[in-house]
Swiss-Prot record:
E.C. designation(s): 6.1.1.17
Protein name per UniProt: Glutamate--tRNA ligase
A single GO molecular function term of this UniProt record: glutamate-tRNA ligase activity
GO biological process, any: glutamyl-tRNA aminoacylation
First-listed, main subcellular location of the protein, grouped into a coarse class: cytoplasm
Keyword Protein biosynthesis appears in the UniProt entry: yes
Keyword terms: Aminoacyl-tRNA synthetase, ATP-binding, Cytoplasm, Ligase, Nucleotide-binding, Protein biosynthesis
Entries under Gene3D superfamilies matching the protein: 1.10.10.350, Glutamate-tRNA synthetase, class I, anticodon-binding domain 1 (1.10.8.70), HUPs (3.40.50.620)
Reactions catalysed, as given in the entry: tRNA(Glu) + L-glutamate + ATP = L-glutamyl-tRNA(Glu) + AMP + diphosphate
Matching Pfam families: Anticodon_2, tRNA-synt_1c
HAMAP family (UniProt xref): Glu_tRNA_synth_type1
Quaternary structure note: Monomer.
Organism: Acidovorax sp. (strain JS42)
GO terms for cellular component: cytosol
Length: 469
């Protein structure tokens, strides 16, 4: 028997920006499809007409594109599938799985109040549910009914969740779900089932806020004669305060992390570890993640976001990246920091600057700040470093060093030899010269090897900055 091809989906609602908690629900189904030579589908659940916007769709697509979570099919839009939903609804109604309910909102509210007063769980009581021998109330004039799904009344509904283990619900706990509104538009749980059936979804990997929807969806799948997919309900992502990550609680849009200089592969690495593990491995490439990923090592407890940890993960990926590749990624940030493209194109220094400074940086923004210093005309040295190191005592050494820089052959070894000559002539130790030189030429006393920095900075800029004191 041929094994069924894995087909997964990410089905966001376009009602706002997409944050890290949302995007993790895209990462895992994407990774599972890629790891199994499967198909990853993007579906936009845009039936909330009041809140759904095209701008939100664009933000979802932009965030997924940045993280390179490419989809094989879609995006499909639920609003474009309304005729299909109504067709399937008619089939269910013809098969006796659906019935019209004429109970008004006022009647439902009164029922709920009576149940709560009796300390019962509020639920629809089946007034309009047709049963053999049951006499239904007279149909009220001018009232458009909702359509309800006939939930099985006995036994249990359950599934083996790939994240949470066995989950079961008593059917007696579930009332008859509204699956179409009075105007005929179908509701969320019904649309999802039709989509998953039509798109042949094999694995539904989503947040655990959907656990309570799942028994209802299983009943609908079974009524449709569809194969019930495998479910994996991911634990919540918490923010740094331990609350559920959400826009209201200050979560940032995924694209903001892009603008702050995080690398897509570092974000994938960090998000992967927020609910899945491969032994003690903390840092891994996208290719390694896809090689290792399966549903057997999903965590059961909530993952808590930690921005300091994210920065650390990003720093590891920065250090490991090829210099030319890193230069291409940091370039727009250097331009944003005020360096014209023409200056960057004038020489090949940017990859070498990246090589020299990437170990000191956590983000592309950090790296761009260092790179900027090599291209701009004037810099503003750190005031504390200037006061500490650029003193009258340092002046003779700086003058001698400036004179040496005017004639030295321009390579790292020659610059190093010139520094040592000045130290020897004046009887100084390296920090007595290197520190003020760093402050004047780079703006800070804390840089990599001074000869390597000076070689990249160039004779003209060094002399101009030494004279500016």
């Amino acid at each position: 028997m041929t094994q069924q091809q894995v087909r997964t989906r990410f089905a966001p609602s376009p009602t706002g920006f997409i944050h890290l908690g949302n995007i993790r629900s895209a990462l895992y189904p994407w990774a599972f499809a890629r790891a199994n030579d499967g198909v990853f589908i993007l579906r936009i659940e845009d039936t909330d007409l009041e809140r759904s916007t095209q701008a939100s769709v664009d933000v979802i697509l932009e965030g997924m594109s940045w993280l390179q979570l490419d989809h094989d099919e879609g995006p499909y839009y639920q609003m474009q599938r309304m005729e299909r939903y109504k067709e399937v609804l008619a089939q269910l109604q013809a098969a006796g799985h659906v019935y019209p309910c004429y109970m008004s909102v006022e009647e439902l509210d009164a029922l709920r109040e009576r149940q709560m007063a009796a300390k019962e769980k509020p639920r629809y009581d089946g007034t309009w549910r047709p049963e053999p021998g049951k006499v239904l109330p007279p149909v009220p004039e001018g009232v458009k009914p909702v359509l309800r799904f006939k939930t099985p009344q006995g036994g249990v509904v359950g599934w083996d969740d790939k994240c949470k283990g066995r989950i079961e619900f008593q059917n007696s706990e579930l009332d008859d779900l509204v699956i179409a509104r009075p105007d005929g538009t179908p509701t969320y749980n019904f649309c999802v089932c039709v989509d998953d059936m039509d798109m042949r979804i094999t694995h539904v990997i989503r947040g655990d806020d959907h656990v309570n929807n799942t028994p209802r969806q299983i009943h609908i799948f079974e009524a449709l004669g569809a194969t019930v997919p495998v479910f994996a309900h991911l634990p919540t992502v918490l923010n740094e305060q331990g609350e559920k990550m959400s826009k209201r609680n200050g979560a940032k849009a995924v694209t903001q992390y892009r603008d702050e200089g995080y690398l897509p592969d570092a974000m994938v690495n960090y998000l992967a570890r927020l609910g899945w593990s491969h032994g003690d491995d903390e840092i891994f490439s996208r290719a390694q993640f896809l090689e290792w990923f399966n549903l057997d090592h999903l965590g059961r407890s909530a993952g808590q976001f930690d921005e300091a940890k994210l920065r650390w993960v990003n720093a590891q990926h920065l250090k490991a990246m090829e210099d030319a590749q890193l230069a291409a990624l940091v370039r727009p940030f250097v331009v944003q920091a005020g360096v014209p493209e023409t200056q960057l194109d004038a020489d090949d220094r940017l990859p070498r600057i990246c090589a020299l400074f990437k170990d000191r940086c956590e983000t592309l923004v950090d790296l761009a700040r260092w790179a900027r210093v090599f291209y701009v005309d004037a810099i503003e040295p750190d005031a504390d470093d200037f006061a500490k190191h650029v003193t009258e005592t340092a002046a003779p050494a700086l003058d001698a060093f400036a004179a040496a820089m005017e004639t030295v052959a321009w390579n790292k070894d020659a610059i190093n030899a010139a520094i040592k000559d000045v130290l020897k002539q004046l009887g100084l130790k390296m920090p007595q010269l290197a520190m003020p030189v760093r402050v004047l030429t780079m703006g800070t006393a804390h840089t990599p090897s001074v000869d390597a920095v000076l070689e990249l900075l160039g004779r003209e800029k060094i002399l101009a900055r030494l004279k500016s004191r």
